[in-house]
Amino acid sequence: RIPVAQSNLNSAVYEPSTGKVIIVSGRRADRSTLFEFDPKQERITGAHELAVKKIDPLLVKGDGSFFLPMRDEGKVARYSASTFALLDTWQFADCPKPSALAQDVTRQRLFVACRGESPVLIVADRETGEVKAKLPITRDVNAVAYDDQHRRLLIPSGVDANLTLVDQQDADHYAVRASVSTLPMAYNMAFDPASQRVFLPAMDFTQPAPTKTEAKPDPLFHANTFSVTTYGP
């Protein structure tokens, strides 16, 4: 076990150009931290404080940089993976809370899932940030994956308890294919392109009612109920 932070570790992503793992700690405070973990040394080798309240999982671009959704700030930023210098910042109309990212490298498209009163998926040029398409999606999306083999997007919703499949007709045109039922609270997802399997973790929970002091209390998860549901092609 390697100590990283006190709490609220959000995700860990391997960055191939540096050979390091970037670990996200989004604390919902005024600042969040990106940690650099060196697998060869098996230790944390760097920590970078950002003036961001909540950082969702980053997306490695593949050119030595990575995209970072900033949900509370309403932005998508791109950083250098070696220096952590800010390279780009994009804001999209009708996207108040960007929460999940995926990409189509072949057709140079960035997919941005946006939370809000009218949730949407933004399809943007991966180099310029220009919006190419937009379509409505389910609520509170926390993960998106692009299946290059079938040219399909996979979009889970833990609130609506489903997995939406969206077909890519061409780089800028998309259509919903189907909605597959999942478990409540199955927000997060891992997609294995080799086996074409989708993995959705979830737990049983109790949702406390809102109070005068807390409009949206955190759910209370039940012990020994963690599961991973697997979907095949």
What are these regions (language model features)?
Residues 1-233:
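Predominantly soluble domains enriched in secretory-pathway, periplasmic, or organellar proteins
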